[in-house]
Amino acid sequence: MTVDHDFNSEDILFPIESMSSIQYVENNNPNNINNDVIPYSLDIKNTVLDSADLNDIQNQETSLNLGLPPLSFDSPLPVTETIPSTTDNSLHLKADSNKNRDARTIENDSEIKSTNNASGSGANQYTTLTSPYPMNDILYNMNNPLQSPSPSSVPQNPTINPPINTASNETNLSPQTSNGNETLISPRAQQHTSIKDNRLSLPNGANSNLFIDTNPNNLNEKLRNQLNSDTNSYSNSISNSNSNSTGNLNSSYFNSLNIDSMLDDYVSSDLLLNDDDDDTNLSRRRFSDVITNQFPSMTNSRNSISHSLDLWNHPKINPSNRNTNLNITTNSTSSSNASPNTTTMNANADSNIAGNPKNNDATIDNELTQILNEYNMNFNDNLGTSTSGKNKSACPSSFDANAMTKINPSQQLQQQLNRVQHKQLTSSHNNSSTNMKSFNSDLYSRRQRASLPIIDDSLSYDLVNKQDEDPKNDMLPNSNLSSSQQFIKPSMILSDNASVIAKVATTGLSNDMPFLTEEGEQNANSTPNFDLSITQMNMAPLSPASSSSTSLATNHFYHHFPQQGHHTMNSKIGSSLRRRKSAVPLMGTVPLTNQQNNISSSSVNSTGNGAGVTKERRPSYRRKSMTPSRRSSVVIESTKELEEKPFHCHICPKSFKRSEHLKRHVRSVHSNERPFACHICDKKFSRSDNLSQHIKTHKKHGDI
């Protein structure tokens, strides 16, 4: 196995101290002879030898002027080629590739034969130049890093180093160090060696290749320092470090590089710890930006249809209008049949409250109630306009603060009854202050939704006595408003087939009402008399005083109602009410409910003249349980409707118009009878409509 190295461009300098002789291995196999060995020539310049070497060299016959004798690693030194002494410390070996290889081979063979004849022994011993032990260790570790031991630990063959052998004309150069000076040899050529070769062979022939050092100065310095130390310790350190072809020779060379300190400089724990100690806060996390506002934006819209339809063009009430309303209300109070002293006292007290600028509560209350009055639509406001001879009546359904503070609701109802009955009824006494407070709290707690039309009982009073009123007062609602303020709500648009009471509730009065014609009056005698009963839907049970006082107020109305001859109109109202109960909430809403609650605390004992009021027995109220959505709705029903239900349940007090309804009621509520059976799944039902609905499910699933 041959390892080739090119030394054409680099000079390898190595010491020759502690050189040993190399045993020549005779190879009897001619096939292993390597004829490609490049010969070397020895160029000696300024070589300094010790005294023993100088004496040996001076005894030779070779003169210095003969030039440089040839010398190669693959042949022993001839006797005639003596190394002269010079004044330099370096010995350079240079390759001479221009010489004839065949001539050198013949010369080497002749030298071998002469040497064998001179020694006369079986083992041919030659003395020649070789590399030092440290160099052998490096070469061995380069090619065989896993092998042990190193060549330095292998015992070498004994060599004979005679000073001068004149008989065989051989010279043995045993280089020694004199006074610390070293002799260096620099070979320069390509070397091909083989273990079993008849020429010069190193102890580790396979590992005889040299390495390249890119920094010769640093390498020479390390070699000089290391050669002064122990050879064995040096070889052990080299074998453990497994040095490669980078030119590093020992551990001290690695330590001189300070690789660990360089790594510590680049990756420092202090640098990592103190990295975020600056005040710039560049490495901290950026705070999140607030995208939405902290509070939602407030809009004017309530997201309801009623808000967008009712408030877009209502006129604003200025303080002058409020004062006018205050004066009108005071005049109407003084002109009523109520007690003059009580009315004057209330008007004066309220005017003082309204006129005092320091009373903030009263001012805020007036403004709030005025806004609520604008918010709710009142169709009874403009049924009659105030003239110089007549006073405008206060509307009980509107949220009027002046009306609430000047006149009690019971007095308002009494004034309306007196106006309808041509002031023939007596006024009632004023309520106590506690009743007034309870009425105000109930009024605000039961505020009606603005989108529903407000129709109170005063409308029916005006309808009954319309012929007795001034024709100038019969005007449509909102007739005095400007064109920009008049609008029609969607709930006011009715079809032509709508009932009369629905048209009155939405569009107001008109001259072509069928129940106000003369035909209606002619049919008054043929129409049976009936009574109207105001029912309160899903309200709390009234106290006995409440029911008696409410029936008393109703009796005032019916005491004079037959005298007007309007039974036909009332019958038509009742019949239309039965036909269209779900059309529009009729005849009173929250204000009427509040008035009834207020009436419960009032007691009408006598008239202004002291004459007692005749009490008549009327049918009691009948209450129905309704859904919470219609808790505040109030309707008018006649007693004739109650009499038209002859089929009474023997278990509960319910009555029905038809017997089928009674049977269905008994089957579904009071008994477990199931006469209607399904012919598909054998389920039984108490009602036929339930069976029909069940059969539809079978059709939907494809069972039929």
From Swiss-Prot:
<dbReference type="GO" id="GO:1902075">
    <property type="term" value="P:cellular response to salt"/>
</dbReference>
<dbReference type="GO" id="GO:0008270">
    <property type="term" value="F:zinc ion binding"/>
</dbReference>
<dbReference type="GO" id="GO:0000987">
    <property type="term" value="F:cis-regulatory region sequence-specific DNA binding"/>
</dbReference>
<protein>
    <recommendedName>
        <fullName>Zinc finger protein MSN2</fullName>
    </recommendedName>
</protein>
<feature type="short sequence motif" description="9aaTAD">
    <location>
        <begin position="261"/>
        <end position="269"/>
    </location>
</feature>
<keyword id="KW-0804">Transcription</keyword>
<feature type="compositionally biased region" description="Polar residues">
    <location>
        <begin position="167"/>
        <end position="193"/>
    </location>
</feature>
<feature type="compositionally biased region" description="Polar residues">
    <location>
        <begin position="426"/>
        <end position="437"/>
    </location>
</feature>
<dbReference type="GO" id="GO:0071468">
    <property type="term" value="P:cellular response to acidic pH"/>
</dbReference>
<keyword id="KW-0010">Activator</keyword>
<feature type="compositionally biased region" description="Low complexity">
    <location>
        <begin position="141"/>
        <end position="166"/>
    </location>
</feature>
<dbReference type="GO" id="GO:0061433">
    <property type="term" value="P:cellular response to caloric restriction"/>
</dbReference>
<keyword id="KW-0479">Metal-binding</keyword>
<dbReference type="GO" id="GO:0005829">
    <property type="term" value="C:cytosol"/>
</dbReference>
<keyword id="KW-0597">Phosphoprotein</keyword>
<comment type="subunit">
    <text>Interacts with WHI2.</text>
</comment>
<dbReference type="GO" id="GO:0071500">
    <property type="term" value="P:cellular response to nitrosative stress"/>
</dbReference>
<keyword id="KW-0677">Repeat</keyword>
<dbReference type="GO" id="GO:0070417">
    <property type="term" value="P:cellular response to cold"/>
</dbReference>
<dbReference type="GO" id="GO:0045944">
    <property type="term" value="P:positive regulation of transcription by RNA polymerase II"/>
</dbReference>
<feature type="modified residue" description="Phosphoserine">
    <location>
        <position position="288"/>
    </location>
</feature>
<dbReference type="GO" id="GO:0005634">
    <property type="term" value="C:nucleus"/>
</dbReference>
<feature type="region of interest" description="Disordered">
    <location>
        <begin position="592"/>
        <end position="634"/>
    </location>
</feature>
<dbReference type="InterPro" id="IPR013087">
    <property type="entry name" value="Znf_C2H2_type"/>
</dbReference>
<dbReference type="GO" id="GO:0006338">
    <property type="term" value="P:chromatin remodeling"/>
</dbReference>
<feature type="modified residue" description="Phosphoserine">
    <location>
        <position position="582"/>
    </location>
</feature>
<dbReference type="GO" id="GO:0042149">
    <property type="term" value="P:cellular response to glucose starvation"/>
</dbReference>
<dbReference type="GO" id="GO:0042594">
    <property type="term" value="P:response to starvation"/>
</dbReference>
<dbReference type="GO" id="GO:0071464">
    <property type="term" value="P:cellular response to hydrostatic pressure"/>
</dbReference>
<dbReference type="InterPro" id="IPR050331">
    <property type="entry name" value="Zinc_finger"/>
</dbReference>
<keyword id="KW-0863">Zinc-finger</keyword>
<feature type="compositionally biased region" description="Polar residues">
    <location>
        <begin position="113"/>
        <end position="133"/>
    </location>
</feature>
<dbReference type="GO" id="GO:0071476">
    <property type="term" value="P:cellular hypotonic response"/>
</dbReference>
<keyword id="KW-0963">Cytoplasm</keyword>
<dbReference type="GO" id="GO:0071243">
    <property type="term" value="P:cellular response to arsenic-containing substance"/>
</dbReference>
<feature type="region of interest" description="Disordered">
    <location>
        <begin position="84"/>
        <end position="246"/>
    </location>
</feature>
<dbReference type="GO" id="GO:0034224">
    <property type="term" value="P:cellular response to zinc ion starvation"/>
</dbReference>
<feature type="compositionally biased region" description="Low complexity">
    <location>
        <begin position="593"/>
        <end position="608"/>
    </location>
</feature>
<keyword id="KW-0539">Nucleus</keyword>
<feature type="zinc finger region" description="C2H2-type 2">
    <location>
        <begin position="676"/>
        <end position="698"/>
    </location>
</feature>
<feature type="compositionally biased region" description="Basic and acidic residues">
    <location>
        <begin position="91"/>
        <end position="112"/>
    </location>
</feature>
<dbReference type="GO" id="GO:0006357">
    <property type="term" value="P:regulation of transcription by RNA polymerase II"/>
</dbReference>
